Amino acid sequence: MRQGFQTPKLDTRAAIFKDNKILLVEENDGTWSMLGGWVDVMETVKSNTVKEVKEEAGLDVDAVRVIALHDRNLHNQPPYAYNVCKVFVLCKVKGGCFHPNIETVGSGYFSLDELPPLSVDKNSYQQIEMCFIARSEKNWQGEFD
C-alpha cells in the first residue's frame, strides 16, 4: 500500500423531511442525531448516505443534493484529534420502515422548535436549522468551510 499524508475522514448526514419535520434517530445513549456515519472504503458520499439510512432507519432513500460540507471541529463538540469533513445530504424517502438495530433504538420526525436532546458530536442545532433552510430554498448554493 502506498504511504501518504494523513487526510480527513468523511462523515455523511442525511436530511430527511416529512410534513416540515426532520427525521432523527435515537442513539443508545438517549441522544438523537441525523442518520449517517463514516464513509466506508469503496463507497461514495452518495452511496454511503443511502447505506447508512438503510442500516439505521430501515428506509430506502434517494440522495438528492449536497447541503453543506463542514469541518467537524468548527461546528461540533468535543473536538477530535483528527480532521473530519461532514457532508450533509438532502434525501427523499422511497419506502421502508424503522426497525430497532445495533446502532439506533428509535426514530422520529421533529420540528425545529421541538428537537430532542441532540448528539452534538454528530450534529448541532445550527446544522439541523441549516438543513431546514436548505430544504425550503430551491436555489440553495451549499455551505462549505
Predicted segments, located by residue:
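Short linear capping/connector segments at secondary-structure termini
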Residues: 1, 29-30, 103-105
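Acidic, metal-coordinating catalytic segment for phosphate/diphosphate chemistry
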Residues: 1-13
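Charged linear interaction tracts used for macromolecular binding and regulation
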Residues: 12-13, 22-42, 46, 50, ...
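Generic preference for hydrophobic
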Residues: 14, 63-66
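A cytosolic small-molecule/anion-sensing beta-strand core signal
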Residues: 18
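Short hydrophobic alpha-helix segments
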Residues: 26, 67-70
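Unchanged
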Residues: 39-63, 71-127, 140-144
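Eukaryotic, compositionally biased intrinsically disordered regions
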Residues: 127-133
